[in-house]
Amino acid sequence: METALTKTPEKRQVIFLAILLLLWEASSEAISYSMPEETESGYLVANLAQDLGLRVGELTTRGARIHHNGNKELLQLDAERGNLLLKEKPDREALCGATEPCVLHFQIILENPVQFFQTDLQFTDINDHFPEFPDTEMLLKIQEIAQPGTVFPLKAAQDPDIGSNAVQNYTVSPNLHFHVVTLSRSDDRKYPELVLDRALDREEQPELTLILTALDGGAPPKSGTTTVRIEVVDINDNAPQFLQSLYAVEVPENSPLNALVVTVSARDLDAGIHGNVAYSLFQGGGGPQPFVIDEITGEIRLKGALDFEATSYYTMEIVATDSGGLSGKCTVAIQVLDVNDNAPKLTISSLTSSIPENAPEAVVAVFSVSDPDSGDNGRMVCSIQNGLPFLLKPTFKNFYTLVTERPLDRESNAEYNITITVSDLGTPRLTTQHTITVQVSDINDNAPAFTQTSYTLFVHENNSPALHIGTISATDSDSGSNGLIIYSLLPPHDQQLGLASLISINSDNGQLFALRALDYEALQAFEFHVGATDRGSPALSSEALVRVVVLDDNDNAPFVLYPLQNASAPCTELLPRAAEPGYLITKVVAVDRDSGQNAWLSFQLLKATEPGLFSVWAHNGEVRTTRLLSERDAPKHRLLLLVKDNGEPLRSASVMLQVLVVDGFSQPYLPLPEVALNPTQEEDMLTLYLVIALASVSSLFLLSVLLFVGVKLCKKAREASLADCSIPEGHFPSHLVDVSGAGTLSQSYHYEVCLTEDSGTSDFKFMNPIIPSSLLQDS
């Protein structure tokens, strides 16, 4: 991703063009200060808080700091008092050389919000340097025939000071032949020329010695001197002349040492030794020059490395002197060409290494870029990788702010490595990269999420207490305490469930435990909700449904409903002697409280006095005859029936049945009972049974009447008041209800018990069947 004035397919780039800088500078006024150089450290430059219109404490709270743009750090900020202090003594000449004015540019950076203030500090020059000549002695060879008014150039003195503190005047010691004049170059530097006032006579005075003095304009002025020794030579009437008065050349700054810069050429019309010309580097502007000249050929070559960023332009004077002392001069102007030899520099001013997720636009870093090259070599493009939720914003004058483009999500990416790439536009391009690591700090923005919306757990009944029946699990993509989950049981919708006595949960890992043994016959299944809550602030939670299904174990034996079993005597059924094969004697009705295959019942005839006469249907418990009865068959038979389920382990119940063979229902043949009972005791038992039966029938009848009346009253009340009326519904186990309405016996008999005072054997009297005999035979 890139922020740019122009976009490429690869990157969005931000290009600071000159026009953008000009527009910014036009709209931003810098705060300027001025002070003389060589001021002692600790000097109070200004009260910065007052000048910026800020409260004193605001500089500290907003993290105020100074950005020096790569310059020497001469200033320090007392943020508590708001004072801008001098850190060390400044030397204008070391800072700016001959550049005027000497201005130190720096920025004041504030955070929360980010603000920039351009500030300039100008150092004024003081006269702290003496003029100094490059040589302690200068030698001039002047022919004795030189005419008055002839001018002889002299080497200028150097003074690092500028303006009026630089060299302003030259004087020469009193003499009869010469005076000195002070002239100015195009850069306003002063240089001396020696003017002949009176003709020389070698024979009279072959050599003269003068003292040349250079004076600056300080108060008081400072001076420097050198000795000018003049040798008077014989006549030489032609001075050397250069072919060009000005040589202008361009040299790339990366030229190697000893590279040829330019060749100057001068000629002398004299013959012989007076026509021989020697070249010398006579005058350079402002200090040592990285050039050397061959005195014979006039070739000017590099003797030191060039640096466009340090000095981009050189001017020097070349003197051609013949053996007679006559000379000529020319000017060589050398323009150093910039090459792209400096990679951009990136300076981090402010860096935030941790950003909270879901935060709006946040400042990650503030940095500046610089490139001392010129032109396209110094123009820069700043970019970051594509696909990152960050933007580069140009804030001011080569400053960028790295901000978040949108709220971050720590769960998607907890760390970003942002590579800032700064490239110049030179050929070839030079690039600097800097990587910033940003950590995304977590906030509690994710609720725990269960791995399933609902859980179904299976547990066998009769389990041991504290049995682990299953585990629910939730995850939270937050970190730290925001991602720690606490599990809990939520209050059930059915308050009668008693969940707290059935189930417990481990709050740390979500394991569920059955607190007590479960009974399938009492509770086949139940549901409840579990909650998962994190430890964030505020805490977030979610819930899931848990359904516990109790699996049936074969823990109940079949229970025989009919015939009723008596511990003292088995149930007695009657069999007509004329019964056809397949005659239904009775039907064994049994139930099993278990479910599934544990409740699948089968019937079996275990033992009979006449095994070939009777059979039991395995699936419905019907006891039938298998053949016709004969006279040889006994009048009484005992049958032992077995009712068993299909569970594991198999459980069963036995039924003892006594069958009496009778010739007819009106005159049954009843043998004496095997055990003689006390008649009084038998009468008491029969009476008790009759009372119980009568009470049961009466209760059922009364209950039915009450229920019928209640239903009618509820219907009338609902119709009258248009209000809801709920009728309680009884719960009857499905395996105890005869859905077909046919019952378990296919024949209905009416029994009448006849008790007489002289009935010693308490015989039963059987009435005719309620159902016609023809129907019985059809069945």
From Swiss-Prot:
UniProt xrefs under Pfam families: Cadherin, Cadherin_2, Cadherin_C_2
Topological region Extracellular: 29-690
Topological type in the membrane: Single-pass type I membrane protein
Residues that span the membrane, as ranges: 691-711
Classification via Gene3D superfamilies: Cadherins (2.60.40.60)
PROSITE patterns, sorted: CADHERIN_1 (PS00232), CADHERIN_2 (PS50268)
Subcellular localization: Cell membrane
SUPFAM superfamilies: Cadherin-like
Side Cytoplasmic, residues: 712-779
Signal peptide: 1-28
Disulfide bonds: 96-102
InterPro entries for the chain: Cadherin-like_dom, Cadherin-like_sf, Cadherin_C, Cadherin_CS, Cadherin_N, Protocadherin/Cadherin-CA
Recorded GO MF terms: calcium ion binding; identical protein binding
Primary localization: membrane
Chain positions carrying an annotated carbohydrate: 169, 223, 225, 227, 417, 566
Keywords: Calcium, Cell adhesion, Cell membrane, Disulfide bond, Glycoprotein, Membrane, Metal-binding, Repeat, Signal, Transmembrane, Transmembrane helix
Boundaries of every Cadherin domain copy: 75-133, 134-242, 243-346, 347-450, 451-560, 575-675
Recorded superkingdom: Eukaryota
GO cellular component: plasma membrane
A biological-process GO annotation: homophilic cell adhesion via plasma membrane adhesion molecules
Domain topic, free-text comment: Cadherin 1 to cadherin 4 domains mediate homophilic trans-interaction, the interaction with an identical protocadherin expressed by a neighboring cell. This is a head-to-tail interaction, the cadherin 1 domain interacting with the cadherin 4 domain and the cadherin 2 domain interacting the cadherin 3 domain of the other protocadherin. The cadherin 6 domain mediates promiscuous interactions with protocadherins on the same cell membrane. Each cadherin domain binds three calcium ions.
Function noted in UniProt: Calcium-dependent cell-adhesion protein involved in cells self-recognition and non-self discrimination. Thereby, it is involved in the establishment and maintenance of specific neuronal connections in the brain.
Oligomer status and interactors: Forms homodimers in trans (molecules expressed by two different cells). Forms promiscuous heterodimers in cis (at the plasma membrane of the same cell) with other protocadherins.
Protein name: Protocadherin beta-8
